[in-house]
Amino acid sequence: HTAIIAGFLISFLGGSRVQIGGPTGAFMIIVYGIVTEFGVNGLILATIMAGIIMILMGLMKMGSVIKYIPYPITTGFTSGIALTIFSSQINDFFGLGIESIPPEFINKWGAYIGAFSNIDFSTTIVGLLALAIILVWPKINKRIPGALIALIVTSAIVSIFNMEVATIGSKFGELSSKLPEMNIPAFDLNQIKMLIPPAFTIAILGSIESLLSAVVSDGMIGSKHRSNMELIAQGVANIASGLFGGIPATGAIARTVANIKNGGRTPVAGMVHAITLLLIMLLFMPLAKMVPLASLAAVLIVVAYNM
């Protein structure tokens, strides 16, 4: 829901031509901490408050400070996100079966090492097949993304041969095919006071991640983003996400890079991305449940490598 609602608004209103917005892995530790302390309602309210802060930051022209961030920081940020994405896919790619993965990087790899004897070879074969298709397909046809072909082919193979590998459906169960109704969360003055620090955390980190993603995309396509407009768009998107029960959204550098690699050059690509997700949710959710998690992991591993 967040990727659909916030993603559309970020592309429609944003200051970057190719930015793809939505929830990101870099935010999951923050989200987890807020939910643990304040509950889901607290997270939703903090997301809305963060959106208001981001709009104010944009109106105050604070997006311009991005030009003072050194290039090594941008490179380090991108590499860090790539490493985070890669490390988050190991469990699904090898079928390790870890139910609860620690969010901390070192602890996460410790859990992987401890569970490596549980590698599921069927899952690994599916992941390797998806990886091979993604790498080879561009030599056959550059118009159709290799990731899409990989997901379709591996989903069909798993279904036809009734392979016992984890899929979106087996992990998440029945997926809702409806958008939630807009709802203003219950709140009081004391709750707002307690949520000011988390809201500022979401706003500051979301702004930095979005603007750094925009800088990276500028370097890839030779464009120049409008940083203050990007902050305003991010703020509007987070308010809308919260009102529909979503989580914080920001510029997603992995999806932005994937967008550029697949030929996206205008905001229309981001809007089509959001509409496509909506259509999948409304029309093809039963088919989406068939997608192997190992195949999704392969797609994200390639995205991380390309970053």
Regions found by a protein language model. Name each.
Residues 1-307:
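Transmembrane helical cores of multi-pass ion-transport proteins
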